[in-house]
Amino acid sequence: MKIDEFMTTRIESIDADRSVYDAIEKMVDRRIRSLLVVFSGKDKDHGVITARDIVFKVLSKKSDPKSIKIASIASKPIVSIDRAKTIHDAAALMEEAVIARVFVCEEGKIVGVLSLLDVMAASLILRARGNYVP
């Protein structure tokens, strides 16, 4: 089963120079757990900030999220996988990198994101179709 059958194509992003507080607001407002972090200038790679990053790196340390820039806690570079790969390929990559989501790319451009929940949904569908391979 191909990744693009389960990936989310609406990717929410935020600038790296914004505050962690801004990320919290956006994530809570949109009911999402991660944001693609966009870096400007000479360092144009992407990063990711997750709810886990915010809780463990900022809130648990009683730091002020308004005074911390996203760039300082974002994970970088992102882990990505080609759109043509399978759900099993994505699951193996997530396990190897110990991450909960991978960004899906096509010809070097980010076209989606696939989460652990998406992988579990694919597993249920494969099992229901009788195509499940453990």
Across the structure, where does each feature detected by a protein language model lie?
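The conserved cystathionine-beta-synthase
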Residues: 14-32, 38-39, 80-98, 104-105, ...
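Short glycine-rich, polar/acidic loop-and-turn segments at beta strand-coil junctions
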Residues: 39-41, 53
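Local beta-strand N-terminus motif with an aromatic residue
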Residues: 32, 45-46
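Tandem CBS (Bateman) regulatory domains
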Residues: 1-9, 46-79, 86-95, 113-134
